[in-house]
């Protein structure tokens, strides 16, 4: 199978073809996703909650991400594999480069970092040193203590303009992808249309170029609070492979996320 690349996603954006992505943390699920044609995966620091049982992503280390990245890469050798740089792993550009090198050696094609214009220098440095970067704006879980919880971001003109400005700054610095989390649909549309790079949404409506879900949410195995934007595809299909195919089909057709999964 031909490898999926950043250029593949750029082509999807140009052709207005929506694409699905998902988090993955181990060999078996990565192989299953790849076998079903779901070829863009993220080793997210969400593993702190879904795999390790913490109440936030903050305890996750670079070593944790590298371990799971290597496992996912073995399961899906041709996927486009993103890996999060976790909390406090990119406080300076130099630290970001050192930690990015670790997860790239483990098998990542790209690193994802959370934050706006303050990251411009870091994005430039990584890009110049052949480390592709995915930005992450809106609800950035590593900032949960500043936000005072997991809340929708970008409501109101000032907040919306700030997020659009951040998105443009990250793109100008060299970011090649952007994740938008928990923002109003109207803002997600503005940002997606303003950027040349593909935008992946989670809780951002069906107006972005792609979608991502935490796999535990997609299969209804998350304990406790279920995010508004989540949908249990396994409940509808009763089969995990069929659930993956259903998720992809609904994203590609624009059925998911629906109005009931979106914010305004």
From Swiss-Prot:
Q: How is the cofactor bound?
A: Binds 1 Mg(2+) ion per subunit.
As for subcellular location, the record says: Cytoplasm
Tell me the domain of life.
Answer: Bacteria
Q: Where is the signal peptide?
A: none
| Any one GO MF annotation of this record | magnesium ion binding
Report the active site residues.
181
* Binding, 3-methyl-2-oxobutanoate: 45-46, 84, 112
User: In which broad location class does this protein mainly occur, judging by the first location in its UniProt entry?
Assistant: cytoplasm
Tell me which EC number(s) this protein carries: 2.1.2.11
What Gene3D superfamilies does the record tag this protein with?
Phosphoenolpyruvate-binding domains
Q: In which pathway does it act?
A: Cofactor biosynthesis; (R)-pantothenate biosynthesis; (R)-pantoate from 3-methyl-2-oxobutanoate: step 1/2
The entry's Mg(2+)-binding residues are 45, 84, 114
Tell me, which GO biological process terms does this entry list?
pantothenate biosynthetic process
Reactions catalysed according to its record = 3-methyl-2-oxobutanoate + (6R)-5,10-methylene-5,6,7,8-tetrahydrofolate + H2O = 2-dehydropantoate + (6S)-5,6,7,8-tetrahydrofolate
Q: Does the keyword Nucleus apply?
A: no
* Self-association state and partner proteins as the record states: Homodecamer; pentamer of dimers.
Job of this protein: Catalyzes the reversible reaction in which hydroxymethyl group from 5,10-methylenetetrahydrofolate is transferred onto alpha-ketoisovalerate to form ketopantoate.
Family per record: Belongs to the PanB family.
Protein name per its UniProtKB record: 3-methyl-2-oxobutanoate hydroxymethyltransferase
């Amino acid at each position: 199978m031909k490898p999926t690349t950043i250029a593949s996603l750029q082509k999807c954006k140009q052709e207005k073809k929506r694409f699905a992505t998902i988090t993955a943390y181990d060999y078996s699920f990565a192989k299953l996703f790849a076998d079903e044609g779901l070829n863009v995966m993220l080793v997210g620091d969400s593993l702190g909650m879904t795999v390790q049982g913490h109440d936030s992503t903050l305890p996750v280390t670079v070593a944790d991400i590298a371990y799971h990245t290597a496992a996912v890469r073995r399961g899906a050798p041709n996927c486009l594999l993103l890996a999060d740089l976790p909390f406090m792993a990119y406080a300076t550009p130099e630290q970001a480069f050192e930690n990015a090198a670790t997860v790239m050696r483990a098998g990542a094609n790209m690193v994802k970092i959370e934050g706006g214009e303050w990251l411009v220098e870091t994005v430039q440095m990584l890009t110049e040193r052949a480390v592709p970067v995915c930005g992450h704006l809106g609800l950035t879980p590593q900032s949960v203590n500043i936000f005072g919880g997991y809340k929708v971001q970008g409501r109101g003109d000032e907040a919306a303009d700030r997020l659009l400005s951040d998105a443009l700054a990250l793109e100008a610095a060299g970011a090649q992808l952007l994740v938008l989390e928990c923002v109003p649909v109207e803002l997600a549309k503005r940002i997606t249309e303003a950027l040349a790079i593909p935008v992946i949404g989670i809780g951002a409506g069906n107006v972005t170029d792609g979608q991502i879900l935490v796999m535990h949410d997609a299969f209804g195995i998350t304990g406790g609070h279920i995010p508004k934007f989540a949908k249990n595809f396994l409940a509808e299909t009763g089969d995990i492979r069929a659930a993956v195919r259903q998720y992809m089909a609904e994203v590609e057709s624009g059925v998911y996320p629906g109005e009931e999964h979106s914010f305004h």
